[in-house]
C-alpha cells in the first residue's frame, strides 16, 4: 500500500489503471500440466525430483472430493512489529463482511506486512500472485501485484508473508480507503477475490 504521502485522493492518476505493477520476479512452470503428468516427468532426474519436492508434488497429492477449489485462502493477517497480529478467518463469511465494512486501522507512517495462510488442492498452481487495487473516494490511488509463487497440492497449508510496506503520512493521506484484493495465477484464473477497508489515522486507536 504505497499510497503517495501528501497526495490528494481527488487527484486521479491514469497510470495507476495499468496492470503492470509487480513486486517480485515472475515465476513460471512452462506449459500447464496435470499433477499426474508432473509426477511422471523424468523420474530418474535427481534435480527434477528435488524441484518437484520443493513444490510439494508427491505421489499422494491432495484432492478432496467435496471441495473443487484449487486455491483456498484460509487466513489473512495484518502484521506489525510490537503489536499482536490482526487475523481474519477468510473461510468465515461474517469475518469477511466485517473487514469489508469496518476493516483495519493503520497508524500513519507505520511499517506493516500482510500474511496469508492458504492451501492448494488438486493440481499444481503456477505463478500465484496477490493483486490489489486501492481506492479512496472512488479514485484509484494505488495498484500492486505481489508474487507469491508456485505450489503443489498439499493438505498442510502454506504461509506467505509480504515484504514490509509503509502507511502514508500527512493530513491529506489520513482517512478511509477501500481495497479490492484477488489471488490470480499465471493462467489468469482468479482463485479468490474480496474487498476490505482500512483507515489511515494518527494513532492505532
Swiss-Prot record:
Q: Which UniProt keywords are present, listed alphabetically?
A: Cytoplasm, Nucleus, Phosphoprotein
Locations of Polar residues compositional bias?
1-11
Which Pfam families does this entry report, sorted A to Z? Answer: Rho_GDI (PF02115)
Q: Which domain of life is it from?
A: Eukaryota
Q: What are the record's GO terms for cellular component?
A: cytosol; membrane; nucleus
Q: Chief localization class? A: cytoplasm
Q: Does the keyword Glycosyltransferase apply?
A: no
GO terms of molecular function: Rho GDP-dissociation inhibitor activity
Give residues where Phosphoserine occurs: 63
User: Which residues fall in a coiled-coil region?
Assistant: none
Q: Where is this region: Disordered?
A: 1-31
What's an example GO BP annotation here?
Answer: actin cytoskeleton organization
Cellular location(s): Cytoplasm; Nucleus
Role = Regulates the GDP/GTP exchange reaction of the Rho proteins by inhibiting the dissociation of GDP from them, and the subsequent binding of GTP to them.
The text of the family note is: Belongs to the Rho GDI family.
What name does the UniProt record give this protein? Rho GDP-dissociation inhibitor
Amino acid at each position: 500500500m504505497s499510497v503517495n504521502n501528501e497526495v490528494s485522493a481527488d487527484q486521479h492518476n491514469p497510470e495507476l489503471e495499468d496492470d503492470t505493477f509487480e513486486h517480485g520476479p515472475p515465476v513460471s512452470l512452462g506449459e500447464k500440466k496435470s499433477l499426474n503428468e508432473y509426477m511422471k516427468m523424468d523420474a530418474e532426474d535427481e534435480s527434477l525430483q528435488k524441484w518437484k519436492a520443493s513444490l510439494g508434488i508427491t505421489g499422494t497429492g491432495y484432492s478432496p472430493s467435496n471441495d473443487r477449489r484449487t486455491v483456498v485462502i484460509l487466513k489473512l493477517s495484518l502484521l506489525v512489529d510490537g503489536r499482536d497480529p490482526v487475523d481474519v478467518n477468510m473461510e468465515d463469511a461474517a469475518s469477511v463482511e466485517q473487514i469489508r465494512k469496518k476493516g483495519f486501522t493503520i497508524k500513519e507512517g507505520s511499517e506493516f506486512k500482510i500474511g496469508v495462510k492458504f492451501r492448494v488442492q488438486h493440481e499444481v498452481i503456477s505463478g500465484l500472485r496477490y493483486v490489489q487495487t486501492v481506492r479512496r473516494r472512488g479514485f484509484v490511488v494505488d495498484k500492486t501485484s505481489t508474487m507469491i509463487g508456485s505450489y503443489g497440492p498439499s493438505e498442510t497449508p502454506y504461509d506467505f508473508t509480504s515484504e514490509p510496506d509503509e502507511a502514508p503520512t500527512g493530513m491529506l493521506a489520513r482517512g478511509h480507503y477501500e481495497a479490492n484484493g484477488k489471488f490470480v495465477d499465471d493462467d489468469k484464473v482468479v482463485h479468490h477475490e474480496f474487498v476490505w477497508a482500512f483507515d489511515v489515522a494518527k494513532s492505532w486507536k
